[in-house]
From Swiss-Prot:
Topology of the protein relative to the lipid bilayer: Peripheral membrane protein
Cellular component annotations (GO), alphabetically ordered: phycobilisome; plasma membrane-derived thylakoid membrane
Principal location: membrane
Keywords carried by this UniProt record: Antenna complex, Bile pigment, Chromophore, Electron transport, Membrane, Methylation, Photosynthesis, Phycobilisome, Thylakoid, Transport
Domain of life the protein comes from: Bacteria
Cell compartment(s), UniProt: Cellular thylakoid membrane
Keyword Membrane in annotation: yes
Protein name as catalogued: Allophycocyanin beta chain
Modification N4-methylasparagine, positions: 71
Organism whose genome encodes this protein: Mastigocladus laminosus (Fischerella sp.)
Length: 161
């Protein structure tokens, strides 16, 4: 996992140079949104279960996926879906705090699509639930932090698609 600071410093270090104006602007931007990201992470942590519950209600609960024969029909499958959504929320929050999506590749996306396909987990329903979670989260953390979190939810969705 990298954070925005490490990424900027490593880029300059590899080139054997001091931080240039563009690198310093990236750091300035990262630091200027620090309080916003920490407040958002605090709100998300305090409301994680409710965020996941509302996202499921908005996107999956009354669809064919929860009816007999659907992929979330049994309690075990439903619990696995809830667990996965909570996992995505947690790692999207980590990525937002770091200002870098690399943790999502390392800890979430590597092999996930293949695993879901082999288990018969519908990718489109997963993406739909993540998009619902993005909306629910934005309504709790406000438009600016919601936009920032949205980047990482979209990154997960893109990686699954």
């Amino acid at each position: 996992m990298q954070d925005a600071i490490t990424a900027v410093i490593n880029s300059s270090d590899v080139q054997g140079k001091y931080l240039d104006t563009a690198a310093l602007e990236k750091l300035k931007s990262y630091f200027s949104t620090g309080e916003l990201r920490v407040r958002a992470a605090t709100t998300i942590a305090a409301n994680a279960a409710a965020i996941v519950k509302e996202a499921v209600a908005k996107s999956l609960l009354y669809s064919d996926i929860t009816r007999p024969g659907g992929n979330m029909y049994t309690t075990r499958r439903y619990a696995a879906c809830i667990r996965d959504l909570d996992y995505y929320l947690r790692y999207a929050t980590y990525a937002m705090l770091a200002g870098d999506p690399s943790i999502l590749d390392e800890r979430v996306l590597n092999g996930l699509k293949e695993t879901y396909n082999s288990l018969g987990v519908p990718i489109s329903a997963t993406v739909q639930a993540i998009q619902a979670m993005k909306e629910v989260t934005a309504s709790l953390v406000g438009p600016d932090a919601g936009k920032e979190m949205g980047v990482y939810f979209d990154y997960i969705c893109s990686g699954l698609s």
